Structures are given as C-alpha cells and as structure tokens.
Amino acid sequence: MIERIWSGRNALYLLLLPFSLFYGLISNFTRLSYRWGWRKAWRAPVPVVVVGNLTAGGNGKTPVVIWLVQALQQRGLRVGVVSRGYGGKAEYYPLVLGPKTTTDEAGDEPVLIYQRTGATVAVAPVRAQAVKAVLRSAAVDIIITDDGLQHYALARDIEIVVIDGERRFGNGWWLPAGPMRERAARLQSVTAIVTNGGKALPGEMAMRLTPGLAVNLKTGERRPVTELDNIVAMAGIGHPPRFFNTLRQLGVTPLRQVAFADHQHYSAESLYSLTSSGQTLLMTEKDAVKASAFAADNWWYLPVDASLPTAEAEALLATITATSAG
C-alpha cells in the first residue's frame, strides 16, 4: 500500500499532504539553520564522507558503503565507519563493534559492514559521538558515515547520494505523503550521485548489484545459487522485491517469497517455520548476519557487491583520496 501511495498511483497521498508540508518545513529549516550559521556543526579532525539518500526505503546504500570502504582500503587508507545503528539497542553509546557484537546491539547494517570490511565501526544516535569513538579506538585517515545525509550536526567533506533507479523519487513529496526526506533539488549540491538499477540520468553513476555465490550460513560452503533446490526466498530489507527480482534474473524461481520489514528482529522459530523437509531457505546477506547464530543446515544467503563504471569510480575515489591527503 505504501508503495502505491508514494508512487502517486493511490490518491490517499493527498490526505497526507498537510503532514508532508510540515515535515518539509522542519527539514528545510534544519538544513538552513546550519548553512546560515544559526547552529554549529561539529567537524572531525579527519575528512568525513557521507553516503546517504533522499528517500526512505532501501536504495542499495550499504553495498555502496562496503564498496567504498574496500576501495579506499586498497589505496592504503585507514577507514573508519559510523552509523546510527538502526534496529540495534546497545546498553551504552557510542558502541565500537567487535567480533562478538550482535545485531541486537548494533543493528544489522553496521555488523554487515564490519564483517565485510574489517574497518573500525562505531554506532551512536549522535554521529559525532560515534566519530569520536572511532578516533579513540584506531588511527584512521577518513570516516565514512553510513546514512546521515540529513544529519547536519556532523560536518562533511564529501556527499554521495544513492538513488533507486527504478523507483526514483516516487510522487516527489516529503514524508509521509511521499518517500522524500529532502527534495530532489538537493542533488545539485552533492559530490556524486549513484543510481542503483534502472536508467542513470546524465551526471549520475550507474551502479549494478552483482550477485556472488550462495553461501551456507552454517558451513560457509559456496555454490551457484542455481544449484540449490526447492528454494524459499526471504528478504528483510528496505525493498524486498529487488532481491526477488535478482533471483529471477539468475534463473531461480522460488517456491515462495517471504518479505519482512527492514531491520526486523528474527527468532529461530519464525525462520525455521518458513521451510519444510527438503526445502532450502535463501536470504540476503543482511538477513544472514541476524540469523547466523541459530542457522540451520539448509539456510543460505546470496551476497551482492556494488559494481560501478571504472572511469567514474576512479574519479570519485581520486577526489576522496585527495581530500584525505589535504
């Protein structure tokens, strides 16, 4: 229903417009209060790169963060990552992730980024506190903030916006009548625009999510996803249809598709009940970090990696590296 409202195909969005106008007023006031110096942003002693979006819902931001961290690490930079930690509830903040940190504490995306990159990752509701925690924990050359484009209390040097190329900006209205956190005109002031799927417009970098081999949650075994039998597919991400569409593009037709809310907590019982004897449960990597502690033998996940045009990616990385060197 919400997708239809946000796309403009359902007239119910008209009833929500008064709330959207209020949201837009607050959003604009917040941004301008920092721009005009009425409120002061905290600036870290190292460059800060924000990877965020203008819309609510899954746009493929986390794969971009992972790609960026790994690419900068390959260039010899020591990278720290900060996040709000959505879906997690730690006993204290800021929380610096370690090998035993759970998704219940830190949230699924920070744990996934930590596991994939090995970078120093910290979470806190106030991102400046997370940055300070990273700086106390490790020597870093640059900070990547996962989301937080609208968190203007943290000064930034580079802004990267990730767009869903299929859904774009829906009906263009602010939340809750539409999907927008900020209006599309905000793109005029960012460093780079990465478009996930669909058709990239001039000035945008076309990104594709490239699937890897399916991985068994319990054993770590890897095999082509087409070799798995009797698949029940599940996804608890911002936009589950993207995962299901990926499977279809790979030639996989699941027996059933189960969509969960983004950042939803799982229990062993709720996931064990999804399959019966002889069936395979296939999930996203983001789901896997939440389910690995109680995984069954027939549970697999499909990792994806962000792929960007080489020349444009190199130009962006050069800009970021130069900022770090300066």
From Swiss-Prot:
It catalyses: a lipid A disaccharide + ATP = a lipid IVA + ADP + H(+). Pathway: Glycolipid biosynthesis; lipid IV(A) biosynthesis; lipid IV(A) from (3R)-3-hydroxytetradecanoyl-[acyl-carrier-protein] and UDP-N-acetyl-alpha-D-glucosamine: step 6/6. This is Tetraacyldisaccharide 4'-kinase. The gene is lpxK. Belongs to the LpxK family. ATP binds at residues 55-62. It holds the Pfam family LpxK. One of its GO terms (cellular component) is plasma membrane. Disulfide bonds: none annotated. It comes from the Bacteria. It is an enzyme of class 2 (transferase). Keywords: ATP-binding, Kinase, Lipid A biosynthesis, Lipid biosynthesis, Lipid metabolism, Nucleotide-binding, Transferase. Its EC number is 2.7.1.130. Transfers the gamma-phosphate of ATP to the 4'-position of a tetraacyldisaccharide 1-phosphate intermediate (termed DS-1-P) to form tetraacyldisaccharide 1,4'-bis-phosphate (lipid IVA). One of its GO terms (biological process) is lipid A biosynthetic process. The keyword Lipid metabolism applies. The keyword Transferase applies. GO terms for molecular function: ATP binding; tetraacyldisaccharide 4'-kinase activity. PANTHER family: TETRAACYLDISACCHARIDE 4'-KINASE, TETRAACYLDISACCHARIDE 4'-KINASE, MITOCHONDRIAL-RELATED.
